[in-house]
Amino acid sequence: MFSQLFGKYLIENDVINEGQFDDILAKMEQTRAKLGLIAVSEGILTKEKAEEINILQTQKDARFGDIAVEEGYITKEQLDTLLSKQGNPYMKFIQVLEEVTGIEQSKIDKYVEDFRKSIGFTPEELESLKNEDIDKIVPMFAYASNPYVTRIAALALRNITRFVTTNYYIGKIEHVSSFDYRAFAGQRCEGAINTVIGFAVKND
């Protein structure tokens, strides 16, 4: 979800175009984030140390993480943490964004911070978005007096992610008296709470 929201922000601010964004999303499917990028993003390594390890890789038959531990730059525990984040969508998006556009990581970091401020998120909320934590993301968009609204929204998003696609994002919740749509699929639920849950399409 971060990729879609941040990508939309970059397009609206003329940093990238829609063609580049589509290219980034396609390449993300075949990408695992590089350990060096993750280590720098997490503040575990400086950019200079990561580049030094990259140079050492050309001289040794060893992986980035193994060299970093061998040189004493990171611990084995830190390496395990970095490895667990290689499939993180945020890390993959940042890496492919840099590869496709040539924008340096320091500048990308500034765009991320500008994006956070523009959407009004706290640093903690931004981290939830980066980590695709749906249970924490939904309340950031869905301000509702009834807690079941956010629970239903979170359930719907989890199922979209599991069974349909990860290529989507949500916007702020809206209370409306009418809604125009081209197609609608839903179901009425009756019980302790009577409600209609559905998906509507406005256009093609």
PLM ranges: what are they?
Residues S118-D204:
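Generalized protein targeting/export and membrane-interface segments
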Residues M1-V138, R158-R162, S178:
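Non-catalytic accessory regions
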